[in-house]
């Protein structure tokens, strides 16, 4: 009896400890999604209530229970055109590329960036580091969608979630016809699809807009896109998925180049935590349903579409930063007067992913020394290699400032290598803002680069410590 009582008491203690951890988790979720799964009040403003979607495209999101505990959230998404599209995609550079990355890259190469009908996506399982079986599973997802479209070899595949686990493939493929039947072109259809690709995201990321091209001023073109990502985000793509669709008639011969240009200046210019995922994919589909002249290289239409796509991709990428796990601030890092764009990007990237800079921002601490430190080591050679000269950074020419987003004057922290007498009260006011900019002037050239990042809060640890539980 004593042994039984001891066992019961032990179980009660464990239950009590678990309850305490759960309550602490609930109380700590100030910025990430509440345990209830609702969108935090501060993030609701980023979720559109209407949209303008490209002709000929439809979307859906359904729940199939990729994760057994998920019985309500959509976790399989379809986005497709009613006609074949020109298509391009940019993928992760991580050497452990997930099966859907390998599959989709191979398909685009085989099809010459033409004849793609749609994209099928699952969340909840990354299908990464899953061997030959994982690649077969990606193919089965594509085949199930192809059969719905009445096509063959026409579907790109994306997956996101936990690495190293096989997909419940029969559960997914048997429900893809249901996802196809649920497709529609309304705002609600697109928004549900955007929800289906989310993992630790606190809100669905969806943008749409219309635009015009010089050769067809009377034609209204449309572009829409969804993305996901909140952690494991760093350039060269990260746990970041993006699907962009347009009804403009963009040639398959130029689509890869315009997408790469746009991604380099948007998705590859954000960082949450410096980790690059196995699954990153941003795909662009153009079906030409709106008509007009085909967009080809070396034309005003090409330049105009490039600008539209880059601006659009930048706005999508910024939503990822705003949803950084546990983030309380959206921070623009701008490096100007650099000797080269490469140097500017490297320095901006280093500052943006510095844990010391990010925690200081969370703590509202104007510790500019951390910014300067990151600037100083950003171009230094790796340990074991000869020490390199770094003419791109000259201490006595370097300036650092906080730029408030409320229109007030910049706060200079370092001027030509000399520290300013910082007004701590003014610095605190700037660091209270949800949006702010760090400006670094190098004084060694005329090139520049911009990165977007967020702060690190206690919540980042909570989310990632609990990720698989």
From Swiss-Prot:
Catalyzes two activities which are involved in the cyclic version of arginine biosynthesis: the synthesis of acetylglutamate from glutamate and acetyl-CoA, and of ornithine by transacetylation between acetylornithine and glutamate. Its EC number is 2.3.1.35, 2.3.1.1. PANTHER family: ARGININE BIOSYNTHESIS BIFUNCTIONAL PROTEIN ARGJ, ARGININE BIOSYNTHESIS BIFUNCTIONAL PROTEIN ARGJ, MITOCHONDRIAL. Belongs to the ArgJ family. The record marks 160-161 as: Involved in the stabilization of negative charge on the oxyanion by the formation of the oxyanion hole. It is an enzyme of class 2 (transferase). It catalyses: N(2)-acetyl-L-ornithine + L-glutamate = N-acetyl-L-glutamate + L-ornithine; L-glutamate + acetyl-CoA = N-acetyl-L-glutamate + CoA + H(+). The active site is at residue 239. This is Arginine biosynthesis bifunctional protein ArgJ, mitochondrial. Gene3D superfamilies: arginine biosynthesis bifunctional protein suprefamily (3.30.2330.10), ArgJ beta chain, C-terminal domain (3.10.20.340), L-amino peptidase D-ALA esterase/amidase (3.60.70.12). It comes from Sordaria macrospora (strain ATCC MYA-333 / DSM 997 / K(L3346) / K-hell). One of its GO terms (molecular function) is L-glutamate N-acetyltransferase activity.
């Amino acid at each position: 009896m004593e042994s039984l009582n001891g066992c019961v008491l032990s179980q009660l203690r464990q239950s009590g400890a678990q309850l305490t951890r759960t309550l602490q988790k609930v109380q700590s979720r100030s910025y990430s999604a509440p345990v209830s799964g609702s969108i935090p009040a501060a993030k609701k403003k980023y979720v559109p209530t209407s949209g303008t979607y490209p002709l000929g495209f439809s979307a859906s999101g359904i729940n199939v229970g990729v994760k057994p505990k998920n019985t309500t959230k959509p976790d399989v998404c379809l986005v497709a055109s009613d006609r074949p599209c020109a298509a391009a995609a940019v993928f992760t550079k991580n050497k452990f590329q997930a099966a859907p990355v390998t599959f989709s890259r191979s398909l685009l190469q085989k099809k010459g960036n033409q004849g793609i009908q749609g994209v099928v996506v699952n969340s909840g399982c990354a299908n990464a580091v899953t061997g030959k079986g994982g690649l077969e599973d990606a193919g089965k997802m594509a085949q199930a969608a192809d059969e719905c479209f009445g096509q063959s070899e026409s579907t790109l595949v994306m997956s996101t979630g936990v690495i190293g686990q096989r997909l419940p493939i029969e559960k997914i493929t048997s429900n893809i016809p249901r996802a196809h039947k649920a497709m529609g072109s309304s705002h609600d259809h697109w928004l549900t699809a955007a929800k289906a690709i989310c993992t630790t995201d606190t809100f669905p990321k969806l943008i749409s807009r219309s635009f015009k091209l010089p050769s067809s001023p009377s034609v209204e073109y449309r572009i829409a896109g969804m993305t996901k990502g909140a952690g494991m985000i760093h350039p060269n793509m990260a746990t970041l998925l993006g699907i962009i669709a347009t009804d403009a008639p963009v040639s398959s011969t130029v689509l890869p180049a315009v997408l790469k240009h746009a991604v380099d200046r948007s998705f590859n210019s954000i960082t949450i935590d410096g980790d690059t995922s196995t699954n990153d994919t941003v795909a662009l589909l153009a079906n030409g349903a709106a008509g007009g002249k085909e967009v080809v290289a070396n034309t005003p239409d090409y330049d105009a579409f490039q600008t539209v796509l880059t601006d659009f991709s930048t706005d999508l990428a910024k939503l990822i930063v705003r949803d950084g796990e546990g983030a309380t601030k959206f921070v623009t890092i701008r490096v100007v007067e650099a000797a080269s764009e490469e140097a500017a990007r490297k320095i901006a990237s280093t500052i943006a992913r510095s844990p010391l800079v990010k925690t200081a921002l969370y703590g509202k601490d104007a510790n500019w020394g951390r910014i300067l430190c990151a600037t100083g080591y950003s171009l230094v050679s790796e340990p074991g290699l000869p020490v390199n000269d770094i003419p791109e950074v000259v201490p006595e020419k370097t300036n650092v400032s906080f730029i408030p987003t409320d229109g007030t004057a910049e706060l200079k922290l370092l001027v030509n290598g000399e520290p300013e007498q910082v007004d701590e009260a003014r610095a605190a006011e700037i660091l209270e803002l949800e949006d702010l900019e760090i400006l670094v002037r190098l004084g060694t050239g005329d090139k520049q680069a911009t990165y977007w990042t967020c702060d690190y809060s206690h919540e980042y640890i909570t989310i990632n410590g609990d990720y698989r539980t």
